[in-house]
Amino acid sequence: MDYPEPIAKLINSYTKLPGIGPKTATRLAFYTLGMQEDDVVDFSKSLLSAKKDLTFCRICGNITENSVNPCAICQDKSRDQSTVFVVENSRDVMAMENTRDYYGLYHVLNGVISPSAGTGPEDINLPSLIRRLSDHQEINEVIVGTNANAEGEATAMYLARLLKPAGIKVTRLAHGLAVGSDIDYADQLTLIKAVQGRTEL
């Protein structure tokens, strides 16, 4: 038996989210149907507001409000202007900020190099990093914080080959992070140790 069209559309919408298969999407759809109408309206307003009121920082690529661009981190002159922490996504920035142990700048790639997925250096936020390093000679270290998987390693090695000839120190997070792990899932102590024990590429 097919679901009524409104439910089928809702299920289909949930399946577009990462990690949500048809069964979970169905559970979420029926849970949504059981919510109070006010809660559903608030939920939909939150989705629309996040999409409409947020953008990417024009300097680092992190998520920021439309009214705050560059983002608060890029505007903060008290931060160490000589170090840039390169991460895959904005969740990684939040994970590092929550450690309260890193006080430099960030650059969000919004992806990784992945030949199998057809994603090359030009498809991620890499050209802006090169421009940024060229425009800001005070930056003398790039910490590569891509995840410890094949794509993250490929991206790290590409960055090292690209930046080292320019005289920029390129370091990699220490492997207190398990191979295959994502930064935003690591606990704060592991992240602190990974930054402190970073090694040069």
UniProtKB/Swiss-Prot annotation:
Signal peptide: none annotated. Coiled coil: none annotated. Keywords: DNA damage, DNA recombination, DNA repair, Metal-binding, Zinc, Zinc-finger. One of its GO terms (biological process) is DNA repair. A zinc finger (C4-type) spans 57-74. It comes from the Bacteria. The keyword ATP-binding does not apply. One of its GO terms (molecular function) is DNA binding. Gene3D superfamilies: 3.40.1360.10, 6.10.250.240, RecR Domain 1. NCBIfam families: recR. Belongs to the RecR family. May play a role in DNA repair. It seems to be involved in an RecBC-independent recombinational process of DNA repair. It may act with RecF and RecO. This is Recombination protein RecR. The lineage of its organism: Bacteria, Bacillati, Bacillota, Bacilli, Lactobacillales.
